[in-house]
Amino acid sequence: MIKLKDKLIYETLKLVESQGKGGLLCRNKQSDAEFMRPVNEFAAASGRNYTSIKSTLDIIHKNWGYLQRESIKDTGLDAGKASKIFIYRLCESGRSFIKKYEKALVQNADK
């Protein structure tokens, strides 16, 4: 049986994976910056808000280690309080989780 938590992790990891080797970029606070488009579109499409997505990324990074996270200082004019840009990249354990989850989806579909 697939758990809701696993589905949430899977969808978030797939978002990061879709951004390739450059990783998924975001700030602490929502922004209209072009690099934030993937996160904002994902939030809108999944019926979640930006803060929820950012929290999920941080929880996955801290609790399961499926994501690497680094931060860089944002020197853009619109940075304001959100002066750091976080870059999330998929780790090997994250790729492994995606494979296991997709295998479980196939097995459940066969039942």
Language-model regions: role of each:
Residues 1-27:
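Short alpha-helical segments that sit at the start of domains
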Residues 47-63:
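Short amphipathic alpha-helical interaction segments
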